[in-house]
Structure formats: C-alpha cells, structure tokens
C-alpha cells in the first residue's frame, strides 16, 4: 500500500505531500488539482514511459509545474515495510506499484465489443462487454445477481451477438422475461454499477485503483453500496488481494459514507495557484465539537468551507 506521496513541480502540484489510507477520497472544486494527484499516482499513465539512456524517463513539458521543464521535477511514493519509489529526471527511477486509472465514459461503457479476452477494465470502460464475457459462468451469475439486487428493475444480465459481428450486454426486464434491453436502453447508473461490480473479479488486480467522479448518476443508496464494495476490496474480503483506492469527487453526498480521516480537501493558494491539501483535524477537540454540531455530516462540514475545498472559501 502507498502510505504517502510527495509531488515536486508536477502539474498543479508545486510542493505537495499527502498521506494515503486504504481508501482515500480527494474532494475539491473544479481545477483544484484532483486530476493532477490521480495522474501522479499513476506515472506510467501520466508521464511518458519512454526511457532515454541510463534509465532516465522522458518527461513532457506539460507535466511540469507551469510547464517549466527547468524545475526540479519529482514524485516519491512511500510504501509499507519501509519501501519507497521515485520518478525524477535523475537516473535509476523506481516505481513499486501498478495503478488502474478509471475515468469511465458512459458512451464507452455501452459500446459493442469485438469478441476478445479482457481480464481488466480499460480506463474508459470501453471493454466492459469483453470483461464480463471473460468472467467464468459463476462470476457472471454473481455479478448479475448483485446488479439485480441493486437495480431491481432487472432479473438477469447476459451477452448477445450483434449483426455487426460483435457482441453486447443485455438486461432482462424484471416483469417480462421475454424483454431484453440493450445498454442504450438502461440508465447510466446501471452501466456504472456493472462496471464497478466486475472489478472484484479481475484475475491480476492492480495495487491501486483510482476513480474520477464515481458518484455520477448514482442514487445515494447506491453510493453507500459502492463504498461498501470498495471497502471489501481494500481489505481483501473480496478479490484476489487487497487493493488500495483513491477517489476524486465533487459530491457532498459521497462524503456521508466515508470517514473523516479518509478525506483530503484540495484548494488552490491565492498567491500562485499551487495546490494545497488539508486533512480533517480529527484529533483536535474543536474538530470533534464541530463534527457533532454538524451531526457527523462530513458533506455539510465540507460545504461550509471550514476545512477547505470549496470555491472562493
């Protein structure tokens, strides 16, 4: 597990250190630096993987603070067991974790797929059909049963060939067994929940999964269920091994289902626009009093602006 990370002159992160928990939630307004943090947690995705001589990474100017490649760029990760990894312009960089970045696209999730083996969900979710197809029959049945529990308008999920020679998902209507709906006929939330449910069955899971705006199109009840699913994956209760998660959100509702110590509030410094990361001061008496006054509503505390991460406050 990544216990902490330090960013130096990386995108919007001029000099930022932050600790991570098994589940960490980044919250803040638009352009507050959440995407920069997620990119820095997945250097193979955000920074050119091409390597020059002497094992030195080629870092594009767009990845530097203010796009100034003369700055001393660097990212350092601290893992459990006193292990560490780093990425910089110096020779001999090391990366000790594998990241699966997810920015799920609703149109991509609905796409037909050319039949192929797919053991992990792609960043946009465009291979969801193939990922579901690759699952064992028992795993498919488990995913279908869980989806139908969470979205009780359906009684099954299946695959069907299309006229184009591809295949696509289909959803059986709960009240009419002869009626099967295509992905274009079901809700956005249905497609997103299905994508989240298949993550637990990836045979070679990443060490870290990052998700941008997981709350989109989900009923508050489903947000609670999603966080419970993620917690089970972080402990290894489900899945091949424990997986760490970092979520980026604008949702006060989602904050109601996580713990204060799991949240990082992001803001921009008014002087130079650099990102600032604050943790909830859970150990202070004042915080505990405020938390009680807000009836332990983390979303309400965030919207009040008292802990940062709100535009103009």
For the regions a protein language model found, what residue spans apply to each?
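Phosphate-coordinating catalytic segments in nucleotide- and nucleic-acid-processing enzymes
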Residues: 45-204, 297-300, 313
